[in-house]
């Protein structure tokens, strides 16, 4: 005798349903649930449970699913219905009529990849949560180091006092009435109050929208900064304040990528923001490879070859991206390299996008901006050919990096030079749709580009804090570099700038084969093993792009101290010994 019990859009047909009791072990329950949740058909056995009815396609496309060797038996051997908790876990009692499914959402979003916050980052946060709950006694480490992302203050970089004091008044202007108390008790200097009053006069309140392009006074401060840096004038009308440089990249890419055939030249290895954004916009990433053997320098012939190859495929290449100093490579471009890229952009009518968010993170040589490079070329055009007059350049900067490290405040800017006024109007419209960048972030941009100067009350502390952060970063970068030099199968370029090292790693054949069996790329497998053994999260080179046949990983050197460097070296030796 059989009975049928409706459950939503499906029904369970149970053989000889009775009541009371069940002799399944926890292991059997787990196996049963796993079979259903994985949507795998099984071989029918006697006295089994059979799923039938119109809801069957939710589990599998076959007419029915048969669960092997799992009868529900009571004391008398009769078959019993499923317990309620299994029914509730596997099926909803309401019809499954969701409008959005993984198959009908924007597939360009689904295809986009952002390795910096991928599987490894998720797993590291699970470990961190476990340790915070006091449940990590089974782990071989007692702390998690997030060396996967340039997030300075997460790794204990202290905020610059002047910046935060100004921000505190911006958030609560009533503090201006307590100037004497703040000065005496918390060390607020006179110039802190002066700056806060100036900014409040411009933005009125950080809780109010600003102009879409950003507060006028702050854009003027940015223009003044660019002029001091480069020796050439800058127009605040050409400057847009943004929610970090990433927001500026998103705006520019949305304007540039007009059709699915649009292409953008991107350096490889690159920050995955670019490939992910192009993927979402259904446009083409046109990779050009940096020269690792020459300190990750830009090879202009390589860029030209990549451009021509893409054009032969029918790709309409409209822009070239340069990251200077590099991410993940840390390389800083020389002035001549910048001139070469600008010359190519002018010849091929490409928009040049200069990602310069690490411009203060330069350890070797000095930073050369693309804006200065363009103005130098225009001034040295002795034949007055006008070759560079129509070149479009967008330069980006951010409060997230450098010695500022205010990632969470989401502030940045981009300057646009040489753009058609009608295009600029469309960019203005695009940013207006998002209303404006966070106003507190705009204020942080202002103090970044206009910090305390010699002779001002806050300057001594500002200078002390700034130099300490810079020197600490440089010291840790060199400690990590020296450790990599001693590690078997690892080679690394000396740290030139930014917040990262991007070493090459050569793994034993047995390790490569084991990675393949695990369904992982070799560098990803190495990084996962490192995380499991040490709690240190780094990013596989594949997430940034790398030449075929090479393996890399990216690590920041933001974490304080050098103890964690020892964790890496010990793990690496054990890993290499394991797979000899």
Q: What is the predicted role of each segment?
A:
Residues 2-5, 71-213, 217-580:
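PLP-dependent class I/II
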């Amino acid at each position: 005798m059989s009975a049928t019990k409706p459950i939503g859009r499906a029904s369970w047909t149970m053989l000889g349903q009775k009541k009371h009791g069940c002799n399944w072990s926890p292991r059997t329950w787990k196996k049963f649930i796993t079979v259903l949740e994985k949507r795998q058909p099984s071989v029918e056995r006697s006295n089994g449970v059979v799923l039938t009815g119109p809801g069957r396609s939710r589990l599998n496309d076959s007419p029915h699913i048969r669960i092997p060797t799992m009868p529900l038996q009571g004391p008398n051997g009769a078959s019993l219905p499923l317990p309620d908790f299994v029914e509730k876990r596997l099926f909803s009692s309401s019809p499954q009529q969701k409008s959005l499914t993984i198959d009908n959402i924007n597939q360009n979003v689904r295809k986009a990849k952002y390795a910096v916050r991928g599987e490894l980052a998720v797993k590291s946060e699970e470990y961190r949560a476990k340790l915070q709950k006091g449940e990590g006694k089974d782990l071989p480490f007692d702390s998690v180091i997030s060396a996967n992302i340039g997030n300075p203050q997460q790794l204990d970089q202290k905020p610059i006092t002047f910046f935060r004091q100004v921000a505190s008044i911006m958030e609560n202007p009533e503090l201006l009435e307590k100037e004497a108390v703040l000065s005496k008790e918390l060390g607020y200097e006179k110039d802190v109050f002066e700056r806060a009053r100036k900014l409040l006069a411009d933005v009125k309140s950080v809780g109010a929208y600003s102009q879409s392009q950003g507060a006028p006074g702050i854009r003027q401060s940015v223009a003044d900064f660019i002029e001091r840096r480069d020796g050439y004038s800058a127009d605040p009308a050409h400057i847009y304040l943004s929610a970090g440089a990433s927001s500026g990249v998103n705006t520019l890419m949305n304007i540039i990528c007009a059709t699915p055939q649009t292409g953008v030249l991107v350096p490889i290895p690159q920050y995955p923001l670019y490939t992910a954004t192009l993927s979402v916009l259904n446009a083409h990433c046109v990779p050009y490879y940096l020269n690792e053997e020459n300190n990750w320098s830009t090879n202009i012939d390589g860029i030209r070859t990549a451009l021509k190859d893409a054009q032969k495929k029918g790709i309409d290449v409209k822009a070239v991206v340069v990251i200077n100093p590099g991410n993940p490579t840390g390389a800083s471009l020389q002035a001549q390299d910048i001139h070469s890229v600008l010359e190519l952009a002018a010849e091929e009518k490409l928009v040049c996008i200069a990602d310069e968010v690490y411009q203060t993170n330069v350890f070797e040589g000095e930073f050369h901006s693309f804006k200065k490079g363009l103005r130098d070329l225009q001034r040295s055009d002795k034949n007055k050919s006008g070759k560079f007059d129509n070149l479009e350049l967008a330069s980006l900067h951010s409060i997230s990096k450098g010695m500022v490290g205010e990632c969470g405040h989401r502030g940045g800017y981009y300057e646009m030079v040489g753009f058609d006024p009608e295009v600029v109007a469309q960019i203005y419209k695009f940013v207006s749709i998002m209303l404006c960048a966070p106003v507190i972030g705009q204020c942080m941009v202002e103090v970044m580009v206009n910090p305390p100067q010699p002779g001002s009350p806050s300057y001594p502390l500002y200078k002390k804090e700034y130099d300490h952060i810079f020197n600490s970063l440089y010291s840790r970068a060199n400690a990590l570099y020296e450790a990599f030099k001693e590690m078997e199968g690892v080679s690394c370029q000396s740290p030139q700038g930014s917040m990262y090292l991007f070493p090459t790693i050569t793994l034993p054949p047995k390790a490569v084969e084991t990675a393949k069996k695990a369904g992982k790329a070799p560098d990803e497998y190495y990084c996962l093993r490192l995380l499991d053994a040490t709690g240190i999260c780094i990013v596989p080179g594949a997430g940034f792009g790398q030449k075929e046949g090479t393996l890399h990983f990216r690590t920041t050197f933001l974490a304080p101290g050098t103890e964690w460097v020892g964790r890496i070296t010990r793990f690496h030796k054990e890993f290499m010994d394991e797979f000899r």
